[in-house]
């Protein structure tokens, strides 16, 4: 077949020129990425498996649009699994600041899970996601106001606010849904009122006008005489203040001749630069083609190697061992397969994971799991005995652990009594030791990506063993971001990974921190806030840590007060909670590595650093003053626990 020539310059030159020229027009403003309020849908998401990929895909589609227009809508999925999204920056926000505001909103909105939708108002932008088309809605029961409480103003200021609101609402209703206005309070410039009014671009002019009029009436009635007020309505955002919060209207500060000189300089540089780009792209393209071909051969080669190795089990042997995969022997169900108990001809108990896949990606996952687990061996990792890749489906064979998974104990009122504090502490330390091995001591560094209670198995002595390497990925020291799909379990996933796909060992550290808090409290991260929109477990632990009342969240099954050394145990538990909070800090670089955490756990007298705020601290209502909004809707957190099996996926 004749190879088509690669025309690089015509393809990349216009794109690069547009980027460089647009960069000349960028201005520096205030991204106003401070969250004002988050409101979540009252209904639960019915399909956990579909939610994450649909939400992430919707956000990616919107991201592309926001970068060019400051606005985006997208739909992913169908029926009850559909994810409708909308994001819009307010009209005075420069595009580069808009992108920053959107990135912040995208990071925070997932806290609504497992509710099936939610909306977030920031001071610079708005975002909403639901499982139905809401684009034409302009009012609803969630409409509310948020008022500042710094200063009470006089009647003259109130008159200026009313005038500014009238001007902004009138202008926005007739000019595409956005307006800014200011009005003097008497003769004093320092007492002026500044107003911003913005409708979502999906609304009709009539709906926009109605929304802004309702918003104006509510903020005047509810916020004056306070110096600041915001109306957070279904179809619009309105704000007034005695401070000029608006970004300046950009002015052309250069002469036309200066701009020409800059453009000519840029164009002359581009000619030279594009030669390098053309060569680089050509080389990268050739390498990619070779890598794809090599990857296909690698899968086939690995399959043959496994079939000929000592790890290989006959399919018929495993089928017989599990009673033809009888449901009576079923141990659990996960996203990638079902796990069964089996008995080999020599009497050994085994756990068999039955995988179904019909594409190369799933096949690669299978060989990746076998290849990775077979190279690691540690007392706190589940041992892989072998596999079968010759039958109608692929099978993994693990050692069988009769106590199954940790979640069966800590989240059960009766079984939880089996695990006193010392046993739970040992499980925490054992899990940490397993992660230290994966991150720092194995021949290939491994990020597990799905550390959670159902993936911590317990042997006959209740020692912890980490299971489920199906999601594990090896990584290089210079690689902190991956392009593969995000995988894991909501509630254990670090915010930077869920929002941006940023994968480092700190993703496991975050998950470990959530697990530690669950072990201490006996609460699931989701279940802790399922009623009345109460706080997530992380936020609950943080607040009690701040108030010095941690013992209020301890699992009653710990029964620490009845022990003769209860004061020592109380101190140990509080220390472990503090370690859990260090793991779940919002900024990844502040989280200690697993080796440091293990050192902290074992050296009980060492002084610990104070943790900073966890993600989504003000997750119920992020507002300026308590009790100021009319309909204070609660908000669930990011956290949830999946239905994964206790032998992993």
From Swiss-Prot:
The EC class name is transferase
Could you tell me which residues carry Phosphothreonine? Answer: 484, 489
Any one GO cellular component localisation term in the record = plasmodesma
SUPFAM superfamilies given in the database record: Protein kinase-like (PK-like)
Domain spans labelled Gnk2-homologous: 33-134, 139-245
Catalytic activity field: L-seryl-[protein] + ATP = O-phospho-L-seryl-[protein] + ADP + H(+); L-threonyl-[protein] + ATP = O-phospho-L-threonyl-[protein] + ADP + H(+)
Q: Where in the cell is it found?
A: Membrane
A GO MF term: protein serine/threonine kinase activity
Topological domains on the Cytoplasmic side lie at: 280-649
Which positions does the record annotate as the modified residue Phosphoserine? 454, 483
EC number from the UniProt entry: 2.7.11.-
- Tell me how this protein sits in the membrane: Single-pass membrane protein
Q: Which UniProt keywords apply?
A: ATP-binding, Glycoprotein, Kinase, Membrane, Nucleotide-binding, Phosphoprotein, Receptor, Repeat, Serine/threonine-protein kinase, Signal, Transferase, Transmembrane, Transmembrane helix
Signal sequence coordinates: 1-29
Glycosylation positions in this chain: 47, 131, 149, 154, 214
Gene Ontology biological process terms, A to Z: callose localization; protein autophosphorylation; protein phosphorylation; reactive oxygen species metabolic process; response to ozone
Q: Which residues form the Protein kinase domain?
A: 325-608
Q: Give the Extracellular compartment stretches of this protein.
A: 30-258
Matching SMART domains: S_TKc
Membrane-crossing residue ranges in chain numbering: 259-279
| Location of Phosphotyrosine modifications | 398, 497
Q: List the disulfide bonds.
A: none
Pfam families hit by this protein: Pkinase, Stress-antifung
Which residues act catalytically here?
450 (proton acceptor)
- Recorded family membership: Belongs to the protein kinase superfamily. Ser/Thr protein kinase family. CRK subfamily.
Protein known as = Cysteine-rich receptor-like protein kinase 2
Species of origin: Arabidopsis thaliana (Mouse-ear cress)
The taxonomy runs: Eukaryota, Viridiplantae, Streptophyta, Embryophyta, Tracheophyta
